Amino acid sequence: MEWKLQRTARRKIRTEEEMLWENIMRVLANGMKQQRNQGSPKELDSVAVTYSSFKSNFVKRLSAEIPVASSPITTRWQLSPARDPESSSSVEEGPPSHTPESLASGLKITPAADTLTLRSHNKNSPKTLSKGSSEVNNSTLRFCKTPLAGDRGWKENLATKGQRCLNQPFSTQKGAQQIDGKMHLCEESRCVRTGCRFGARDEFYLRRFSGVYHSTCQPEVKIHLTGLRNDYYLNTLDWSSQNLVAVALGTSVYIWNGQNHSWIENIDLSVCCHYVSSVTWMREGSCLAVGTSEGEVQLWDAITKKQLRNLHGHLSVVGALSWNHCTLSSGSRLGRVHHHDVRVAQHRVGTLYHKEAVCSLKWSPDGRLLSSGCNDGLLTIWPHDPGAGVQGLPLKVIPQSTAVKAMEWCPWQSEVLAVGGGVKDGCLHVLDINTGKNIQTPSTQSQICSLIWLPKTKEIATGQGAPKNDVALWTCPTLFRSGGFFGHRDRVLHLSLSPDQTRLFSAAADGTACVWKCC
């Protein structure tokens, strides 16, 4: 009898998780095979950016020692590396050694390069265009005399040739749709807008509370806005010292004359971004900073109607901007705050880091402190030269119960800051930043989307959300409700004050804007 020794292997038992991942990988593999069979690999999608394309372009950029500016992949209109002095800027570099010059002697801003390069996936060499050529005049860097101005045929041809925009944030921009912005003055009885035909214009009024007596008055002007994004985390309205109002509508920035209530110009950025995410005027002069959904910050001169330069460095939506003389601070949804000195070629002089998206940035009136509000509910106070030092540590961090978006420094008390609470909070917080404690905290019973101080009347105006969707007025220092502006049918996203501090511009998510006489 022969004995045979049989070796038995232990049977491997697959878990449910392993089987699930096998099924997922099998489905992905089948999908990739179908895509290969349906079309040639040389064909380019005009909208979606695949991970392989993103990775290959990113590696090529790093190998060529060209800094990735404004997005994971280069922008469609990119300054030529050979002519762009700011492309070699580094975050670790300190501030410029020269002494800041007085603004009275004139602001000197380093202009953009003279050569623009149109990048594409074609195998041909990049096409270089001069500023004076007709093709550049049809590009995104233009002022439009009409709201609908724009060469749409050029954009369609660009898409059919496979020249796609590679600077889109890959996490959110897929499937995004561009909206053409419009700005129309309400002409009362002749207005054909929906709502005005049914007498909705008569519902707009200002009410002042004085005991049992209520005084009411109508707004100076009512404006219809098309393309205003209903986004709590954007800052798309600002009123300049030269009485010019800038409001971002879709892919354009409209400039409106606050004196004679007339529309002047609009900046069309439809080719290089999906929407404009933030605007702010320089305190002195006509320089306008524009943040885009692609992480770009552009500087424009409203008088000469020319673009001054691009400030690269962000990888996501730039939702907050704030000037401190010649230093521009920009905050993104990835939690980065960059400080740009617009007078020098290597503009980036400091960087701050947050864990969540930056919702708001405000420099104090004296320029000594910077406050930043984030989506994680942290209100952070930074020194005058944040990020440029060795450590770049904040002076104080004040936790809040909701995201910190509505925020403004007191004009007559430099160490007092007003912060509006979100939906879960609904309170107006007036803080002493030295102690970090609340001075007054009245409840508004709604989301505070925007706020601004009124120095003439010593009040605070807050843009409210549901259920009233009004602009509430609070008397300082008691913070009692003293009145309000009524008529908006959706939350009041943005507020801005005129340079003479007598009029208030309110813009709501229902597409209406009003100019109110506040004193």
From Swiss-Prot:
Residue ranges for the region (Disordered) are 77-106
Instruction: Write the signal peptide boundaries.
Output: none
Instruction: Please note every region of biased composition (Low complexity).
Output: 87-96
Protein location: Cytoplasm
Q: In which tissues has expression of this protein been reported?
A: Expressed in multiciliated cells (MCCs).
Q: Which UniProt keywords apply?
A: Cytoplasm, Repeat, WD repeat
One GO biological process term is: de novo centriole assembly
Record's Gene Ontology CC terms? cytoplasm; deuterosome
Which Gene3D superfamilies does the annotation name? Answer: YVTN repeat-like/Quinoprotein amine dehydrogenase
Q: Which GO terms describe its molecular function?
A: anaphase-promoting complex binding; ubiquitin-protein transferase activator activity
Q: Where are the WD repeats?
A: 229-266, 271-310, 353-392, 399-441, 443-484, 487-519
Q: Which InterPro entries match?
A: Cdc20/Fizzy, WD40/YVTN_repeat-like_dom_sf, WD40_CDC20-Fz, WD40_repeat_dom_sf, WD40_rpt
Pfam families (alphabetical) = WD40_CDC20-Fz
Principal localisation:
cytoplasm
- Family membership noted in the UniProt record: Belongs to the WD repeat CDC20/Fizzy family.
What job does the chain carry out?
Protein regulator of centriole-deuterosome disengagement and subsequently participates in the ciliogenesis in multiciliated cells (MCCs).
PANTHER family of this UniProt entry?
CELL DIVISION CYCLE 20 CDC20 FIZZY -RELATED, CELL DIVISION CYCLE PROTEIN 20 HOMOLOG B
What protein name applies here?
Cell division cycle protein 20 homolog B
Q: Native species of this protein?
A: Mus musculus (Mouse)
Give the organism's phylogenetic lineage: Eukaryota, Metazoa, Chordata, Craniata, Vertebrata
Could you tell me the gene encoding this protein? Answer: Cdc20b
